[in-house]
Structure formats: C-alpha cells, structure tokens
C-alpha cells in the first residue's frame, strides 16, 4: 500500500498535470483533493494538448481509477463540457471516474455572486477567475452548501431553489450591475446535473480506506500552488481552499501518517497570474522572454502570467510547510539562451536581510537579494538523459538542492510527457 502526494510549490501553473500523467502508470488510483474549475492541468502527448479542470490527470491511462474528492468543488456545467471533450478518446468514464458525495456543487448563482463581489472591489480586486469558487467555499464553511450527494435526494431542487434565492438577495447588496438570465443558466445547470448522475457517487473516505487495506497505490493530486493556500499563501490574494499537503488529508479523508512521498513541483523560474505580491517579478526583457518562450498564458483564463526569477525564499517555505521529500523542476528548457540567470536567496526587509517569508511581502517592504549564475545556450528539448544536460544547468540544479535540502528527481525539458528526464 502506497499513498503519495503531488502538489505545486509556487503560485500554481507549475506543471503538475504533466507530472501526474508521467507518474500515473505507477498508481492504481489518482485522487484530486481540492480546488475547482478555476485551475487547469495541462497534459501534452502525441502532439495533442489536453486541459483538465476538474477531472484528475490520470484519466488518459487505462488501468487506474480517478476520484474527485470531497475537498473539490464541482461546476456541473463546466464538468459536462470537460466530459464531452473527452468523448473522442473513447474513455470508459463510467468505470474510470468516480465522485465523492461530499464534494460541493457550484451553482449558477455562485458565479454571479463571484462576479458581483469582484466588481464591487474596484481597484482592490484580488484577480478572481469568476468561476464561483470563493462563494461555493463560503457556503461550505457557512454550512449552507449543496453537495453531490444531495442530487440523490428527492428534495434536491427545493434545496437548490432555497440557496439560489438566498444568493439573489445577496447580489442586491452589492452596488454593481451585472447582466444575467438566470432561467437560461438554470436550464443549463439541471441538464448538466442529469449528465453528472450517469457517474458513480461514492463515500470516498471509505472507498480510499478499503483501497489502502487492499494494498492499492494512491496518488493524491493537488491543484493551484502552495503560495495560493488560503492559510499559508499571500493572503488575501489566494484561492479559497488548502492547497498544501494538509489539504489532501481533509480533502480525501486520508490520515497524515499514511502519506509516504510528497512530490513538490516547481518551475525553474517563477510565475503568477492575477493580482498579488511577487517579489522576483521581472518587468524587463527577462520576464518578457520567459512569458513568450514558456507560453505563459493561463490554461483556463487565458490571462498572461507575470514572470520572474526563481525565489528560493518562497520555495524553501513551501517545501517546509508541505514536508516535501522529492522535487521536480519544470520548464528548464525555457531558460536556455539567457547569458545570466538570477536566483533570489534572501530578502532585504525593514533594514535587515532575512531568509524566510515574512507576513507582508508587498513590494514596498521587500527587496530581493540575488545570486547570479552563468546561463546556457543549448536547446534542451531533445535531450533524454541527465548526462546530456549542460554543466551550467547542472550547477543551477545543484545549488537549488543544497539550498532547499531536498533532491530534484525530475527535470522537465518540454511539454510532452516524453520530454522528462529522471535524475
């Protein structure tokens, strides 16, 4: 029996989907434990790019089960679109994909609330994806939410109507005007609910407990990144769930002492989407080049990601709070061609040099301190072994390992699953 955990160590978009896809053949079960359709996991193989929003990244492999855990929030309409998009691959979703009854549903009015809330903030907006994630988690913690298991109840539509009416009253409190046709949105929602009912709903904590007893191997898949965690991220510019290792326990019902390996995924540089502090953001040519070469656009929102140098202070913090045992570095190929690379090793903070992430990392409080490295010219995308990598990249990797005190086991040199080097 093995339970391992894979999560992002930055502000999301680290490349988790690709690594889950690469590792999937080792596991019987892939289980998503938090988040919703605000984050997309991108996989690329056989020359085709696939973006999954809610469905676990193991869905393309034949011999495993994919679970959507209780910590996930599901938009039935988005989910239906995702399922429809997989139809051409002739996947047996009925046997491969199961959903926790305790996962919460995103209602159309959750999305409307999200839009009204964000619009009301003006310049103080946090950069919400407007997918209804925040309002859904608010209803969850406020004990008002509707869960997947409620679909099986005879009074499901009554429960829906009561909550939707409440949301409409709440929207009126925002001093903004948003245009919507709720009747159309609800028609689409209930049609999607009928499709959702074609899949099996389970008590996922019991299912996973029995799977562990039977010796099955499980990979817990996180969404977004550790610096977006609602407790440990750059609050309030965060998501609404726990994206850290603890979220796997609460989002699946797996005991902490059952988790063996914690795989931490990070980019060779740093990116962020939307608002919020970003100490190593580069506003000059380097950031522009990273965005262009790395194709740094959100897989769900399409927004261009902000780019900058690797922040080791933030990376160490994420490794610490997650108990990471293995690191996997993504997009090493994007840094090819830079004469000089920079890595932030500490901050100047209120007149002192510190090597930890403080409470407030707004630009007026933080100045990154950099160590510089010689870059490399070689194109990495065709390389298949660690020995082939240029010395300068190996020096870069060695420095990160020594600073973070966790080994880098995988180096990604391209988007395709084949462009993955094991160290």
From Swiss-Prot:
SMART domains from the xrefs? Adenylsucc_synt (SM00788)
Q: What's an example GO cellular component term for this entry?
A: cytoplasm
**Record: residues binding GTP:** 12-18, 40-42, 305, 331-333, 412-414
What superkingdom does the record give? Bacteria
Where do the catalytic residues lie?
13 (proton acceptor), 41 (proton donor)
The answer on whether this UniProt entry bears the keyword Glycosyltransferase reads: no
Q: What is its EC number?
A: 6.3.4.4
Q: Which Pfam families match?
A: Adenylsucc_synt
Q: Please give the family membership noted in the entry.
A: Belongs to the adenylosuccinate synthetase family.
* Protein name listed in UniProt: Adenylosuccinate synthetase
- Which organism encodes this protein? Flavobacterium psychrophilum (strain ATCC 49511 / DSM 21280 / CIP 103535 / JIP02/86)
């Amino acid at each position: 029996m093995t339970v391992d955990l894979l999560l992002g160590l930055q502000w999301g978009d680290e490349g988790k989907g690709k690594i889950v896809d690469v590792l999937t053949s080792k596991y019987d079960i892939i289980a998503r434990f938090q988040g919703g359709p605000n984050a997309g996991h991108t996989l690329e193989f056989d020359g085709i790019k696939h973006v999954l929003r809610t469905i676990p990244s193991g869905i393309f492999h034949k011999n495993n089960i994919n679970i959507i855990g209780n910590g996930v929030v599901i938009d039935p309409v988005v989910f239906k679109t995702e399922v429809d998009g997989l139809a051409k691959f002739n996947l047996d979703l009925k046997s491969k994909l199961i959903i926790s009854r305790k996962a919460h549903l995103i209602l159309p009015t959750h999305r409307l609330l999200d839009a009204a809330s964000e619009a009301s903030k003006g310049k103080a907006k946090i950069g919400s994806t407007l997918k209804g994630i925040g309002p859904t988690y608010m209803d969850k913690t406020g004990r008002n939410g509707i869960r997947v298991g409620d679909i099986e109840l005879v009074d499901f539509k009554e429960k829906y109507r009561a909550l939707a009416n409440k949301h409409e009253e709440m929207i009126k409190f925002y001093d903004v005007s948003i245009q919507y046709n709720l009747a159309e949105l609800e028609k689409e929602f209930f049609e999607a609910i009928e499709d959702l009912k074609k899949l099996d709903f389970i008590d996922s904590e019991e299912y996973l407990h029995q799977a562990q007893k039977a010796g099955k191997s499980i990979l817990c898949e996180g969404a977004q990144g550790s610096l977006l965690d609602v407790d440990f991220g750059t609050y309030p510019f965060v998501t609404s769930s726990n994206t850290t290792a603890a979220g796997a326990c609460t989002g699946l019902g797996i005991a902490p002492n059952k988790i063996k390996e914690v795989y931490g995924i990070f980019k060779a540089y740093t990116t962020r989407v939307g608002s919020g502090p970003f100490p190593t953001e580069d506003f000059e040519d380097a950031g522009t080049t990273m965005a262009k070469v790395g194709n740094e656009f959100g897989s769900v929102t399409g927004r261009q990601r902000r780019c900058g140098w690797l922040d080791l202070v933030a990376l160490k913090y994420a490794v610490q709070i997650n108990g990471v045992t293995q690191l996997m570095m993504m997009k090493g190929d994007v840094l090819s061609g830079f004469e000089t690379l920079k890595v932030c090793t500490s901050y100047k903070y209120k007149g002192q040099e510190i090597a930890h992430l403080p409470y407030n990392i707004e630009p007026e409080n933080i100045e990154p301190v950099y160590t510089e490295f010689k870059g490399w010219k070689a194109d990495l995308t065709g390389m298949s072994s660690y020995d082939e990598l240029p010395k300068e990249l190996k020096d870069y990797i060695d420095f990160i390992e020594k600073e973070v005190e966790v080994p880098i086991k995988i180096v990604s040199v391209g988007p395709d699953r084949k462009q993955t080097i094991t160290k």
